Amino acid sequence: MSEFIAENRGADAITRPNWSAVFSVAFCVACLIIVEFLPVSLLTPMAQDLGISEGVAGQSVTVTAFVAMFASLFITQTIQATDRRYVVILFAVLLTISCLLVSFANSFSLLLIGRACLGLALGGFWAMSASLTMRLVPPRTVPKALSVIFGAVSIALVIAAPLGSFLGELIGWRNVFNAAAVMGVLCIFWIIKSLPSLPGKPSHQKQNTFRLLQRPGVMAGMIAIFMSFAGQFAFFTYIRPVYMNLAGFGVDGLTLVLLSFGIASFIGTSLSSFILKRSVKLALAGAPLILAVSALVLTLCGSDKIVATGVAIIWGLTFALVPVGWSTWSTRSLADQAEKAGSIQVAVIQLANTCGAAIGGYALDNIGLTSPLMLSGTLMLLTALLVTAKVKMK
């Protein structure tokens, strides 16, 4: 990582942090995350308005993750020599266009095109977010700047689903995306005003990113990452139809459940460093095991609102360990190739999100209401077993 930081500084090293630029990047991150998860809380009205099933509507999440997967792998090589300021502005424009296309969509095809635009911005932005932040502040301030970025992610995850549910009932799902488009416009203007020129640096070295998978335990780790995130999206994408039909929650009740989920996730993220200091492997094996049990409890007793609410809180609290835990594993196990490892990890997560949402939607439409839960629980159990048996820690 130190080599990567040095590579990204060179001639454009600075001595004073550009906090306005850092906060503009953080705001852009928050907007991307919020828009990514809006369909989760708006799935039912979107499906009804477009005349499609909820399982099919859930593919709006799938296509975003699918496009983001490819963007995260190839965007940094494609735009090597391009000024990063213009690239970030482009991503903010794509975010805005995505929201407008979705809000005016009169067909499922147009909805998917809009969500694909978001995927391009999301995957591309995440692939370069760390290096971008490192070029805005002096080396001593990098940890603080990164905490601002990931703090924005945590806040966005807390408010995205409940805010979407509340506003969707108040102004309609299309106007929710119109409001998100306004946020996109604010992103564009803030970035134009605050982000300095950040020239790209063409590289003539051949990238051997996938060679990292040949290292001992790395392939097992990536498979475990895939299964844990696929299990998450198989459940979370369809939390609205499951909770409204299985537990009988209304829109107001669902909003409170989603808010509880988000707050629990924020608390879990805050506690994750304390837990991971004790044992990374225990956290990575224990968290999916708890989630597997939670999925079973919700399948068997989900008609009870108290049980369903409790499962949502436990799920948010526990799954928060997963992304932080795997990032810790990656930086420890592949410290000499942290950027390449991060690129693969982002791609694996987006592929998992794609498959989890797609298969969960198919199961919901063709097998039954609790089938996404059973799929999620099975994947989480397999993750726990794989981590215990095959994943190596340093």
UniProtKB/Swiss-Prot annotation:
PROSITE patterns: MFS. Keywords: Antiport, Cell inner membrane, Cell membrane, Membrane, Transmembrane, Transmembrane helix, Transport. The gene is nepI. It is found in: Cell inner membrane. Belongs to the major facilitator superfamily. DHA1 family. NepI (TC 2.A.1.2.26) subfamily. GO terms for cellular component: plasma membrane. It is a multi-pass membrane protein. It catalyses: inosine(in) + H(+)(out) = inosine(out) + H(+)(in); guanosine(in) + H(+)(out) = guanosine(out) + H(+)(in). PANTHER family: PURINE EFFLUX PUMP PBUE, PURINE RIBONUCLEOSIDE EFFLUX PUMP NEPI. InterPro entries: MFS, MFS_dom, MFS_Efflux_Transporters, MFS_NepI, MFS_trans_sf. Residues 1-21, 76-85, 129-147, 197-215, 277-281, 327-343, 388-394 are cytoplasmic. This is Purine ribonucleoside efflux pump NepI. Residues 43-54, 107, 169-175, 237-255, 303-305, 365-366 are periplasmic. It comes from Shigella dysenteriae serotype 1 (strain Sd197). Its main location: membrane.
